[in-house]
Curated annotation (Swiss-Prot):
Effect of L79D: No loss of function
Post-translational modification: N- and O-glycosylated. The N-glycosylation mainly consists of a family of biantennary complex-type structures with and without lactosamine extensions and outer arm fucose residues. Also significant amounts of triantennary complexes (22%). Variable sialylation also present in the Asn-43 oligosaccharide. The predominant O-glycans are mono-sialylated forms of the disaccharide, Gal-beta-1,3GalNAc, and their sites of attachment are probably on Thr-76 and Thr-77.
Propeptide: 103-128
Subunit description: Interacts with T-cell surface antigen CD2.
Pfam families: CD59
Alphabetical list of CDD domains matching this protein: TFP_LU_ECD_CD59
Species name: Homo sapiens (Human)
Gene name of this polypeptide: CD59
InterPro entries in the record: CD59 (IPR056949), CD59_antigen_CS (IPR018363), LY6_UPA_recep-like (IPR016054), Snake_toxin-like_sf (IPR045860)
Function: Potent inhibitor of the complement membrane attack complex (MAC) action, which protects human cells from damage during complement activation. Acts by binding to the beta-haipins of C8 (C8A and C8B) components of the assembling MAC, forming an intermolecular beta-sheet that prevents incorporation of the multiple copies of C9 required for complete formation of the osmolytic pore. The soluble form from urine retains its specific complement binding activity, but exhibits greatly reduced ability to inhibit complement membrane attack complex (MAC) assembly on cell membranes.
Effect of K63E: No loss of function
Disulfide bond positions: C28-C51, C31-C38, C44-C64, C70-C88, C89-C94
Glycosylation-annotated residues: N43, K66, T76, T77
GO CC field: cell surface; endoplasmic reticulum membrane; endoplasmic reticulum-Golgi intermediate compartment membrane; ER to Golgi transport vesicle membrane; external side of plasma membrane; extracellular exosome; extracellular space; focal adhesion
Protein name per UniProt: CD59 glycoprotein
């Protein structure tokens, strides 16, 4: 295959890559009201690149989300909840209850980590 054939092949692969990428949107469980057993799957708009599941007391939120907003401050502000556990992910239908129980991030875990880290650093620096 000469240079011209290689260019044609490269062009075809590039076109296929663009069409394959643009045709898929992330699927998430998304329920308008908090519910413990959300089974409604939606194709998220291109504005959203992550799925979110959040538990705040008895409320469970399943939503399409922006990955850049997958942090405690943004989640609590946008959902208007003060104490919660959340889990963000970037695969289709990954925001289900078991994920939250296995890998969620809660305020208490972060607080403990923030309190323990300086003490460990101080102890390490005092060690002869």
């Amino acid at each position: 295959m000469g240079i011209q054939g290689g260019s044609v092949l490269f062009g075809l692969l590039l076109v296929l890559a663009v069409f394959c990428h643009s045709g898929h949107s992330l699927q998430c469980y998304n329920c308008p009201n908090p519910t413990a057993d959300c089974k409604t799957a939606v194709n998220c708009s291109s504005d959203f690149d992550a799925c979110l599941i959040t538990k705040a007391g008895l409320q469970v939120y399943n939503k399409c989300w922006k990955f850049e907003h997958c942090n405690f401050n943004d989640v609590t502000t946008r959902l208007r909840e003060n104490e919660l556990t959340y889990y963000c992910c970037k695969k289709d239908l990954c925001n289900f209850n078991e994920q939250l129980e296995n890998g969620g991030t809660s305020l208490s875990e972060k607080t403990v980590l923030l309190l323990v880290t300086p003490f460990l650093a101080a102890a390490w620096s005092l060690h002869p």
